[in-house]
């Protein structure tokens, strides 16, 4: 493939989110694994303050070092995306300094590796839609619905997908007696629109509930309280090929999710330590494996997803129960989404090629 035939991919990462650093780590892995014979990569960072800046030129800057997590630095040169002159590609132009107005880069495809608020919730997808940009992944509606645990469950139930009981709080700090009876103990208290297990608490006693609600509400004014579902946690990736066909990965079973200090599959276990391991493919019987894969695809379709998703379940004695969906799953070197497809013989580079090749205007 000649240089003229290669696609230029803008990998956008960071963002105004509690998952800023996770996004940076994901972006570094993606940049390292995009096929250089097919793609020219342009890193674009978004700082915690919301400034768009030229991204890291060395992906070593996007890796965790012990417990020190990477962030997007602001060196004063700001850029912004805009519709390209030809109406096809997306331009990133300087808006500050001596080069204000000059083109920093022109991208054929945008890969928004953004997790959490202002990136995975439909907001940046709306911006790219207004620009007419081709981008990897889900559009506005699927991103917004998938980010909100309340609406994910409502849509899933309407589609006949099993879910556990939950109560949603808007400003309240207590549950009614009926709600406590419905949920039982323990419960998990979560920001309704958050990810990477940030702001989540496991509550074993009702006296600890107000503090857990306060913690979750510090991340999102809408709080969801979910009953504990008994059974192993499994994850399943969904990948949309360029021709529109959907592929469900071999599921992964997580082990040791209750071994850490948090008592559940929390942020540290996901990104900073080795208390949790995964078995891929999950040690499930053939019927349960097929059911997990079927429900993953059904959830993907119910939310109107495009490109990719990771769908998480608990496997109970009665069958799989939906936990949540991630419309832009982690792409760190240890993230489950690429690992599940790798176990099926799809390399990280081939996975990224499929995603970029299938990028579309929504």
Swiss-Prot record:
Transmembrane segments: none annotated. GO terms for cellular component: cytosol. Pathway: Cell wall biogenesis; peptidoglycan biosynthesis. Keywords: ATP-binding, Cell shape, Cell wall biogenesis/degradation, Cytoplasm, Ligase, Magnesium, Manganese, Metal-binding, Nucleotide-binding, Peptidoglycan synthesis. GO terms for molecular function: ATP binding; D-alanine-D-alanine ligase activity; metal ion binding. It comes from the Bacteria. ATP binds at residues 180-235. Mg(2+) 2 binds at residues 324, 326. It catalyses: 2 D-alanine + ATP = D-alanyl-D-alanine + ADP + phosphate + H(+). Residues 153-357 form the ATP-grasp domain. HAMAP family: Dala_Dala_lig (MF_00047). Cell wall formation. Belongs to the D-alanine--D-alanine ligase family. This is D-alanine--D-alanine ligase. It comes from Corynebacterium urealyticum (strain ATCC 43042 / DSM 7109).
